Amino acid sequence: MKQKIIGLTLAFFVLFLTAVAILFTVKVQRYLTTSLWAKLSEQTFLVFKNEQDEAQFNQVSWTNFQAETTKKEDKKAFRLYKKKISLEQLENENQQQLFQAVNLSINLKQGWYNITILLPSKALFETVF
């Protein structure tokens, strides 16, 4: 009898954890596909290293992204920067120092894409603002 109670308790506990995990996954996916996409679709802040990367990025419909950096400046720049800068503006070495390369991993239905983009550095924000 005691083993039966322990078994039922464990079964309910596992079922509870599974339900919590499913609800969490659905909530996170909903946030990524609605809230995050709505915020990002209004902004044009990506500066690509070359036209091939830009063409590849524009062709796919992406549902999730993750900036692979721990630097707060990069993340802040990624969120705040709204103006697309042409590559001609980066020809000057002084201007090149205003940008930093950040690797972007994009999770698509077709798989993972790793794209390196240029984001404005903290120095650019100090110059502009």
Curated annotation (Swiss-Prot):
The keyword Membrane applies. It is found in: Membrane. GO terms for cellular component: membrane. It comes from the Bacteria. Keywords: Membrane, Transmembrane, Transmembrane helix. It is a single-pass membrane protein. The chain crosses the membrane at residues 5-25. This is Uncharacterized protein MG389 homolog. It comes from Mycoplasma pneumoniae (strain ATCC 29342 / M129 / Subtype 1). The lineage of its organism: Bacteria, Bacillati, Mycoplasmatota, Mycoplasmoidales, Mycoplasmoidaceae.
